[in-house]
Amino acid sequence: TIIQGELGTKLFLQNLLNQTSVCFDTETTGIDALNAELVGMSFSWQKGEAFYVPFPENNGEAQVLVDKFKPFFESETIEKIGWL
């Protein structure tokens, strides 16, 4: 499922913050972490179901979206499983 728009993002974040364990991955423009741009993030907490959040090309708009995920990444009650 692709998450789009402010309402879609808000509803997705509410659902995300209610999970106990989440697998996530970042999609970037390259493998060099110092120079790559974030283009999206994917999340899954249930077998066979995943969500993709595309990021705007504009760095300012992308940062606003990244900041909305701060409560998820800073939560100590949600296990985060990164994909390599």
Regions found by a protein language model. Give the residues of each.
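Long, highly charged low-complexity segments
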Residues: T1-M41, F55-F72
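Acidic beta-strand-to-loop metal/phosphate-binding motif
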Residues: C23, T77-L84
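Function-dense linear segments that define catalytic or interfacial modules
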Residues: S42-K47, P54-E57, K80
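Residue-level recognition of conserved structural "scaffold" positions that shape functional pockets
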Residues: E37, K47-E49
